[in-house]
A protein has these predicted regions:
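Beta1-alpha1 glycine-rich phosphate/pyrophosphate-binding loop at the start
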Residues: 3, 27-90, 94, 199-240, ...
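Core beta-strand elements of the Rossmann-like FAD/NAD(P) dinucleotide-binding domain
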Residues: 27, 136-147, 290-300
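Short hydrophobic core segments
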Residues: 32, 143-153, 298-306
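A Rossmann-like FAD-binding core segment of flavoenzymes
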Residues: 90, 95-130, 209-306, 310-311
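Glycine-rich dinucleotide-binding loop and its adjacent helix/turn
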Residues: 152-191, 196-202, 324-332
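FAD-site-proximal beta/loop scaffold in flavoenzymes
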Residues: 171-179, 301-351, 380
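Active-site-proximal substrate-binding core of FAD-dependent oxidoreductases
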Residues: 335, 368-406
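A conserved FAD-binding loop/helix module that cradles the flavin
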Residues: 344-380
């Protein structure tokens, strides 16, 4: 199905203004996700004259990258807590005062119907519940836009290890959220571990709360880091500002005397009621622990991240094709395989905030009727070319290696929702020769808890040997939790409309 023909703004009208009297109705664009990519997409779409609705599930724009302090405890200088804060404030303020952009916060997208199911000219129908997730009066809305931009981001991937379910073991993303959003110290003695450049800002943020960071332990060895980051160094010239950020983190680490050690991993956490110590071991190139290198460190908190997993529920529900690496496949326009549906940010590859901003701008511009070859997109296209290369470098340098499964013991919990241990998964796989995730879920209940496999799904796939291209754990007809009463009452209570001017009921 081809997208509707975009309206042409009247001569002399503001770029983000409404069409002149008698002109065709403005093209409608729905953007899901108000992080860097979503904000950039919404702004670019408005500059093309589209009517925009911007949705986010939380109560503030900015996403995880620009996470705010609570209104009850504001900072006199919040800029100091964030990179690119002026970029965020410029984007947010422009959209917030623009009558052609409706920002809907607390908006949970729970389902997307593809065009055939929707039965209309719109590429998809997007069903949303607006209100606090624990509230009893959430309001239903259904959007049928001319174009949909998905910018849903990613979440931490944390590999299991003995003791990872103890209180005091945090994902690095949660640690960053506590530091940025609450200014809360997780403990007095903290270890940061896992893989990827995200460990550096997390350590800096945790140290800024007053905690003593005992070390940052990167699982990848120096050889892997060299392989990922040093080839074709001229490609990094355009990303010089990343060097400035790195220098800032190095300065923070030196100031706080934080060791950075490669080829080491936290392979176990110990404690009774909460974490009291961790075992750090040297690992080989495959991430298998090297016997005799174990070292026990007393801690009261540990923050772990082994990269990020893109949030694919909505792209899959919309019918978008994925790459073999399980990101959304897009072309030069950020268009997916579904006409009228675009994707930007971490769901197309883990490339960082600069790539997300560039992709978002391109997606919003094209969704509103523009072309990726338009002159005013030249800077964004150039930035995308520069920064999307980071995704491949990050994977080469810090990508998860298969030896991590040797950390596990039979009683190590893999699925935390259903408390399914590794031993049960291993025994079931060996007894039934079942490698399919569906049969494993039904037999062991792994992935059937409240998170529906968002946390453990890919881990279980790797343990049972499911094909890497499987999307079983990401395919959810209902993308977010809702009450049976909300589902039953959808038809009479849902407000069905096209996105329009701010203030629409």
């Amino acid at each position: 199905m081809s997208p509707a023909t975009p309206a042409t703004p009247a001569a002399g009208a503001p770029a983000a203004g409404a069409p002149a009297a008698g002109a065709p109705a403005a093209r409608t664009v729905l953007v899901v996700g108000a992080g860097p990519a979503g904000l950039a997409a919404a702004k670019a779409a408005r500059e093309r004259g589209a009517s925009v609705t911007l949705l986010d599930a939380v109560d503030a724009t900015g996403g995880q990258y620009w996470r705010h302090l609570p209104a009850s405890r504001p900072s006199a200088n919040e800029r100091a807590l964030h990179h690119g804060w002026s970029t965020y404030t410029a984007l947010h303020e422009e959209l917030d005062r623009d009558p052609g952009c409706e920002i809907v916060l607390g908006a949970q997208v729970w389902a997307i119907e593809q065009a055939d199911a929707a039965g209309e000219a719109a590429p998809v129908a997007v069903h949303v519940l607006v209100g606090p997730p624990d509230g009893t009066a959430r309001r239903g809305r259904t959007f049928r836009p001319d174009a949909l931009v998905l910018a849903t981001g990613a979440h931490d991937r944390t590999l299991p290890f003995p003791g990872w379910d103890l209180p005091g073991v945090f994902t690095a993303g949660a640690a960053q959220a506590f530091a940025k959003g609450e200014r809360v110290a997780l403990g007095e003695r903290v270890v940061i571990a896992g893989a990827g450049p995200f460990l550096l800002p997390v350590a800096a943020s945790v140290a800024a709360t007053g905690a003593k960071v005992l070390g940052v332990y990167e699982a990848s060895r120096v050889s892997a880091l060299v392989k990922g980051w040093l080839p074709k160094p001229w490609q990094l010239v355009g990303a010089a500002k990343k060097g400035g950020e790195l220098a800032g983190y190095v300065g923070t680490h030196l100031r706080h005397r934080i060791p950075y050690v490669t080829g080491r991993a936290v392979v176990a956490a110990h404690g009774t009621d909460r974490v009291e110590a961790v075992t750090v071991a040297e690992v080989d190139a495959d991430w298998s622990p090297i016997a005799g290198t174990e070292r026990r460190i007393e801690v009261d908190a540990v923050c772990v991240s082994h990269g990020f997993t893109p949030r694919l529920e909505l792209p899959i529900a919309a019918g978008c094709d994925l790459t073999p690496e399980r990101f959304v496949r897009v072309d030069e326009s950020q268009a997916t395989s579904v006409p009228g549906v675009y994707a930007a940010g971490e769901i197309t590859g883990i490339g960082g905030v600069d790539a997300a901003l560039a992709e978002g701008e391109i997606a919003g511009h094209v969704a509103a009727g523009g072309s990726p070859r338009d002159a005013d997109l030249a800077a964004a296209v150039g930035a995308r070319r520069t920064f999307t290369g980071f995704a491949a470098r990050i994977e080469a340098a810090h990508g998860i290696r298969s030896g991590w499964t040797t950390w596990l013991e039979d009683d190590t919990v893999v699925c935390r929702c259903e408390e399914v241990p590794y031993g049960r998964l291993r025994e079931t796989r060996e007894a039934t020769c079942a490698s399919g995730l569906r049969s494993m879920k039904l037999t062991t209940r792994a992935g059937l808890g409240i998170c529906q496999g968002r946390i453990c799904g890919r881990t279980v796939e790797e343990i049972v040997g499911s094909p890497a291209a499987s999307v079983t754990t990401d395919r959810r007809p209902i993308a977010s939790p809702l009450r049976l009463g909300e589902l039953a009452g959808r038809d009479p209570n849902t407000i069905t409309h096209r996105p329009s001017e701010k203030g629409h009921p």
